[in-house]
Amino acid sequence: MLFKSLAGLALAAAAVAKDVTYYWDIGYVTANPDGKLERQVIGVNGVWPPPPLHVSLNDTLVIETRNSLDTPTTLHAHGMYQNGTNYMDGPYMVTQCGIPPGGNMTYRIPIIQTGTYWIHAHFSAQYVDGIRAPLILHNPEEPHKYDEDVVLTLEDWYHDGAAGLLKDFLSWKNPGGAEPVPNGALIGRVGGDELYKLKFTPGKTYRIRLINMSALSMFHFSIEGHKMRVIEVDGVDTEEQEVGNVILSVAQRTSIL
């Protein structure tokens, strides 16, 4: 009877799990997110910014990837364990060869975690050119109570391309190893004179998923006149903790209510 019950549970879990498939054609586009300079960036399917990816616990994230760049590329799901699937982790020449120009690769990642993550290129300094996007792993049995779910990205932005920035950083003319200073910051993928707007309805509780997708910069986040409650840090649910502001270093994620 016990084995029949366990088998039934396994079949039930298998029945609800599914493949969630995205098609990413990675290529060059032009964008001007801070309103200061239009330049070549790396987008997906002919647009920038790349759209967020959403998948649920026990599903499998599938990314059908085509490289339309003139250099290799890879994709890395930041913060994911990749237990048994390290060959899908993405670091160039560490866990995989690069996807060559004109080449294709299918990433298949079983989802055994929940929370807030992000995905980015992991070849050279490529993600500085914009190939980065939120990756949200939903929990069907979400322990925290809220009415709406909002993703808010924070990132620095350079007017020079990643290849030139990396060349200058590694140059003998930079003996102190000074890192390139960004030209500005983007909140919600916009910056400069354009402000990202969040619309709230009084009486509703909002989960804001903060993701620092920068190359260099730390962000201090606060909402004037409001306290916030931290409920998740780097994909790990926490007991609610009231704070006045949140500090996020590069690659960190925090959810607040």
List each model region and its residues.
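Fungal secretory targeting signals
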Residues: M1-A17
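N-terminal processing/targeting junctions
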Residues: G8, A15, A178, P182-G184, ...
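Acidic-aromatic/histidine active-site loop/patch
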Residues: E148-T205, R209-A215
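A conserved active-site cap/scaffold subdomain adjacent to cofactor or substrate pockets
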Residues: I211, S255-L257
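Ligand-binding face of N-terminal immunoglobulin V-set domains in extracellular IgSF glycoproteins
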Residues: A251
